[in-house]
Design a protein with these regions (language model features):
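Short, polar/flexible loop-turn hinges at active-site or ligand-entry regions and domain interfaces
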Residues: 38, 105-109
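Active-site/acyl-donor-binding loops of N-acyltransferases
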Residues: 2-7, 46, 65, 129-201, ...
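Conserved acetyl-CoA-binding loop-helix of GNAT-fold acetyltransferases
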Residues: 108-124, 304-316
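A conserved beta-strand-loop-helix scaffold within acyl/acetyltransferase catalytic domains
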Residues: 15-101, 135-136, 212-300
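Short, well-ordered alpha-helical packing segments
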Residues: 79, 99-102, 116-123, 142-146, ...
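Conserved N-terminal entry element of GNAT/NAT acetyltransferase domains
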Residues: 1-21, 192-223
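Residue-level recognition of the GNAT/N-acetyltransferase active site
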Residues: 103-106, 302
Length: 385
């Protein structure tokens, strides 16, 4: 696909998918962003999905490519188009996650139109686009998508402070807000943090004790994941494709960043679902400081089994020594499961955005709380693994 558009200062603008020969130009693009003071806006040099090369069957519809805008000399904007499927009322629909769109226009205004042209071309290529994250309405990317007519819905955020005192003292959210910082400090030194930790732990362990399920680590997704997806899919108005082939592309076997937990009934060994978790030791993170953060990344099963899946993820991460566990789930059943497991609601900056050509989040469609999306969808895990 090669589309030529009028570019900047009279130069022709070509919008196309990146090729192997574009690597040096992409390195220069990233270097210019760093030199312009936007070193956090770095485009990946490896656009394919983690398990794509090894685990993607020929012609399988889940894969990721980079689309670029160049002016004949250099790349001026780039984004990842993560090709995927979503099942809406049981019907499979192709779509793309629009991940990491970045433009040289953020450091040089003469290239400010690059991202607009790139996004318009991406929408022409695949009208049904979605993206996750973005941030608050004050963020430039948020305002940009709204101007393009994208619809959005906030995905609730939940956290479980495994080590409450350390979390109170370590979260940047508290440190950067004087009143909350004082409250956190008082809570830590007064013993209130330990008391809260005891209550949360008791609540969670009681739920775990009453659970009829048990979990075990799996090295890969297999036929059992296909059966879970087929069995549970009718209970969701909309759900991202989550069969074994897809999951092994996204969370590949052998990748130490992800842990796959298969959850089954005790004794009967009947599958009830699965959950993927991840953990990372942060270092001067803008949200988590130096805390070790565990994430409930993804999961699937019948909606009635969501509490067992969330509890399994929390149990595993707590045993691995994380300080705090976080999750974002839009579906109401999964949000309830987080609260039931003892997780606390917090301020969320994690949104589901849908392009004008997509069928979700329309006024005449089903409620957003019937859409199952999680932190592991799109590029939402990039900062947490």
């Amino acid at each position: 696909m090669r589309i030529v558009r009028s570019g900047f200062e009279g130069a022709p603008m070509e919008i196309r998918f990146a090729e192997d020969g574009d690597l040096d130009a992409m390195i220069r693009f990233n270097r210019r962003l760093r030199e312009g003071g936007r070193g956090e806006e770095q485009m990946t040099l490896h656009p394919s999905l983690p398990g794509e090369a090894r685990y993607r069957p020929p012609g399988f519809p889940v894969y990721r490519r980079m689309m670029i805008a160049e002016d004949g000399r250099e790349i001026r904007a780039a984004m990842l188009l993560y090709h995927h499927n979503v099942f809406i009322k049981g019907e499979r629909r192709d779509f793309c996650w629009a991940d990491m769109p970045v433009s040289e226009g953020i450091i040089d205004r003469k290239y400010s139109l690059a991202i607009i042209q790139l996004m318009k071309r991406a929408a022409a290529y695949q009208p049904f686009l979605m993206t996750m994250g973005v941030g608050t309405p004050e963020v430039e990317a948020f305002r940009f998508l709204v101007k393009l007519g994208w619809r959005w819905r906030l995905a609730p955020f939940f956290f479980y402070p495994v080590r409450v005192t350390k979390t109170l003292l370590g979260l940047r959210y508290f440190k950067e807000r004087p009143k909350l910082r004082l409250a956190a400090l008082l809570g830590a030194v007064s013993g209130a943090g330990a008391g809260l930790g005891g209550l949360l732990s008791l609540r969670h362990h009681l739920a775990s004790f009453l659970s009829t399920c048990q979990s075990a680590e799996e090295i890969a997704f297999d036929d059992w994941a296909d059966r879970i997806f087929t069995d549970a899919l009718p209970e969701y108005a909309a759900a991202i494709r989550s069969d074994a082939s897809t999951l092994n592309i996204v969370y590949p076997p052998g990748d130490p960043r992800y842990t796959r937990l298969r959850v089954r009934r005790k004794g009967a060994k009947e599958d009830v679902g699965w959950i993927v978790v991840a953990s990372k030791q942060m270092k001067d993170n803008r949200y988590f400081g130096d805390l070790k953060v565990g994430t409930l990344a993804d999961g699937f099963g019948r909606v009635a089994n969501a509490p067992a899946l969330v509890a399994a993820g929390i149990d595993h991460l707590a045993e691995t020594g994380v300080d705090i566990i976080v999750a974002n789930f839009l579906h109401a059943a999964w949000a309830r499961a987080c609260r039931r497991a003892g997780m606390l609601p917090g301020p969320s900056t994690y949104n589901l955005f849908v392009s004008p050509g997509g069928p979700l989040l329309r006024d005449d469609s089903f409620p957003p709380e019937e859409i199952h999306v999680a932190r592991g969808h799109g590029d939402g895990l990039d900062a947490l693994v």
